[in-house]
Design a protein with these regions (language model features):
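Metal-dependent amide/peptide-bond hydrolase catalytic core
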Residues: 1-7, 48-51, 83, 175, ...
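Short glycine-aspartate micro-motif
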Residues: 72-74, 102, 159-165, 182-184, ...
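Short helix-capping segments at alpha-helix termini
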Residues: 43, 126-130, 157, 278-283
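Acidic/histidine-rich catalytic neighborhood of metal-dependent amide-processing enzymes
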Residues: 110-182, 383
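N-terminal helical capping/dimerization or prosegment-like subdomains
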Residues: 2-84, 250-254, 268-271, 364, ...
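Active-site metal-coordination/substrate-binding segment of hydrolases
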Residues: 70-138
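A structural signal for short hydrophobic beta-strand segments in well-ordered beta-sheet cores
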Residues: 47, 61, 95-97, 235-238
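Acidic-glycine-rich active-site phosphate/pyrophosphate-binding loop
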Residues: 82-98, 160, 175-186, 347
Length: 384
């Protein structure tokens, strides 16, 4: 049997359409998790599904290898998937095909990658000749903090081996990406009617000043060659006030800083506090709240896992893997960071060129090739 026959392209497409039909965008991975666990168990695969919080489980599937002493390969995908809610030409929960494109809700981030990894573990179960254990971690609540991945890695590992995180990297291999710190700044002033503006303290104007300054701030952090475009600072929400004829008593900014390895919530908080101190408006009170934080991934451009993936690419695509450190994946946050922190030699490799937009799609060829490459990598990794 040729490598390409190990996983049916048509079956994978139908699986991906089914996965995309589950609405799992906001705290609601339970139905998708139940479907995956049932499907895998029906094929005789060892499955552990455990609630991380009520109704929101991880699904961990394991296909044992011939030799349990060999280092395992972990493939990781998240089940939560946000998607653009308006502007679609068809129902996003009913995926459709046009040429090599599969359209559907959250199909590139990362329902397509998840389906590819499920197909990989199923194919490994059928072949029954893996040299090492292959573990699928289908996790809940990736969004920034990676709660599902942190839970399974802390509770059962593995703490040694290799990992592939399947976030959409457009089939390029990334060994490094930044972290993230998200924040909210609340400004409190004093309300006043438009006829008595002098009695008020305008929180919205104070927040606008911060918005302008934050856009040009340079966070404290040591620049590194592997993450040349970081750090970045972005404020995505600015709101305040409650009436057209009233001085705004409160305003809020919500921002996102993509970080370098020596940056963390404490350094970001300090940088934000300095910006506030330099632009403080008399009569205003300021509050900083760090709302989420996640570490980055910093591996090496030459590693055992990259060599194995390159070998898999050559067998599946007749060409080597492309190693990249470019945007946008450089500014992603992935569960690969937690996999590496747990002790796994980890890279990011997944199908899809992610864009949060209506009519989101994924290349069917890339999705199929990704599944085959994940499977072949388990064979390419060296024995010890």
């Amino acid at each position: 049997m040729s490598i390409r026959d190990a996983i049916s392209r048509d079956d994978l497409v139908e699986l991906a359409r089914k996965v995309a039909s589950f609405k799992s965008d906001v705290d609601n991975e339970g139905e998708l998790a139940a479907f995956l666990a049932s499907r895998l168990r029906h094929q005789g695969i060892e499955v552990h599904d455990e609630d991380v919080v009520a109704g929101r489980p991880n699904v961990i599937a394991t296909v044992p290898g011939r030799d349990s002493d060999q280092l395992p390969l972990v493939i990781n995908a998240h089940m939560d998937g946000a998607y653009h809610l308006t502007g679609w030409s068809r129902d996003p929960l009913e995926g459709w095909i046009e040429g090599d494109k599969l359209f559907g809700a959250a199909i590139s981030d990362m329902k397509g990658g998840l389906a590819a990894m499920v197909a990989t573990i199923e194919a490994a179960s059928r072949q029954r000749d893996l040299p090492r254990d292959l573990i699928l971690q289908a996790v809940m609540h990736h969004d920034t903090v990676g709660l599902g991945a942190k839970y399974v890695l802390a509770s059962e590992g593995p703490y040694e081996g290799y990992g592939i995180n399947g976030e959409p990297s457009n089939m390029k291999v990334y060994y490094a990406h930044g972290g993230a710190v998200k924040f909210r700044i609340t400004v409190r002033g004093q309300a006043a009617h438009v006829s008595r503006i002098e009695d008020g303290v305008d929180a919205l104007q104070a927040a606008v000043t911060l918005y302008q300054k934050l856009g040009s701030m340079t966070p404290t952090g040591k620049r590194i060659e592997d993450l040349p475009d970081l750090p970045t600072v972005f404020v995505g929400v600015l709101n305040g006030g409650f009436a057209a004829g009233c001085v705004a008593p409160t305003a809020e900014l919500y921002g996102d800083i993509r970080t370098l390895p020596d940056m963390n919530r404490k350094t970001v908080y300090s940088d934000l506090a300095q910006i506030i101190d330099e632009n403080r408006v008399p009569g205003c009170e300021y509050e900083i709240k760090i709302t989420a934080a996640q570490k980055g991934l910093l591996g090496k451009p030459q590693s055992t896992i990259i060599t194995a993936i390159d070998g898999a690419f050559r067998k599946v695509r007749n060409q080597g893997a492309e190693i990249s450190k470019a945007l946008p994946t450089q500014a992603f946050v992935t569960d690969g960071a937690d996999m590496a922190a747990a002790g796994l030699e980890t890279v990011v490799l997944g199908p899809g060129d992610w864009k949060y937009a209506p009519d989101e799609f994924i290349s069917i060829t890339d999705m199929h090739d990704a599944a085959l490459i994940y499977l072949q990598t388990a064979y390419e990794l060296p024995l010890r």
